[in-house]
A protein has these predicted regions:
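Conserved nucleotide-binding/hydrolysis micro-motifs of P-loop NTPases
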Residues: 43-45, 67-70, 101-105, 129-132, ...
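Conserved G1/Walker A P-loop phosphate-binding module
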Residues: 1-94
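Conserved short-loop catalytic and cofactor-binding motifs
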Residues: 15, 34, 38, 73, ...
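Conserved C-terminal guanine-recognition region of P-loop GTPase G domains, centered on the G4
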Residues: 53-60, 80-154
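Canonical P-loop GTPase G-domain recognition
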Residues: 121-123, 130-189, 193
Length: 205
């Protein structure tokens, strides 16, 4: 139809990857607008692959929250959590590499090595920017990362207060493949109410 700019519908899976305690679960909850994934200062709180669904006018996004990838996973549970995280990109159309400002650690580099093995577009999400008192310090930090890591975009967030979410969501939608929504408009997750209740109890422990 000439004369009309018809925006195509988009659908895809977006995996949140990162080392423990960078704010992946807080980010997932902020993106879908509901407390779905456990938030705790304790490491390795996320033990399962959690799917959160965000539905907008022209796009539906299935976000995958994953356990934090970490080095030295010698315990059986830690090895299992690492396996869950490592397989998350297998079902993703877009990746979000979440890090916590203002540090790039060996574990962040480990996550990047997993990402670069896949031919999947990836955005770098620098969370917790409120911890950086002098924001001018972010520029050399990001420049040092960009020299050796090819991301399709970089976003600065304070997920606890929702800062930077709109720009991130717009960039995610831009990278999604065209497709129709898979879930109902009011669906927030594929997990059962029983599972979510158990997770809420575990968050309080």
């Amino acid at each position: 139809m000439s004369g009309f700019d018809v925006q195509p519908s988009r659908f895809g899976h977006v995996a949140l990857l990162g080392r423990p305690n960078v704010g992946k679960s807080t980010l997932l909850n902020a993106l879908i607008g509901a407390d779905l994934s456990i938030v705790s200062p304790k490491p390795q709180t996320t033990r399962h692959r959690i799917l959160g669904i965000a539905t907008h006018e022209h796009a539906q996004i299935a976000f995958l929250d994953t356990p934090g990838l970490h080095e030295g996973g010698k315990r059986a549970m830690n090895r299992q959590l690492n396996r869950v995280a490592r397989h998350a990109p297998d079902e993703a159309d877009v990746l979000l590499h979440v890090i916590a400002a203002p540090r790039w650690t060996d574990e962040d580099e480990q996550v990047w090595k997993l990402i670069e093995q896949r031919d999947i577009p990836c955005l770098l999400v620098i969370n917790k920017i409120d911890l950086v008192k002098d924001k001018s310090d972010l520029l050399p930090f990001v420049e040092s990362i960009s020299k050796h890591h090819a991301y399709q975009g970089i976003h600065y967030l304070q997920a606890t207060r929702g800062k930077g979410l709109k720009a991130l969501m717009n960039d995610v939608v831009r990278l999604l493949p065209e497709g129709q929504a898979v879930y109902a408009e009011d669906d927030l997750t594929d997990r059962s109410a029983r599972f979510l209740a158990a997770e809420m109890i575990r968050e309080q422990l």
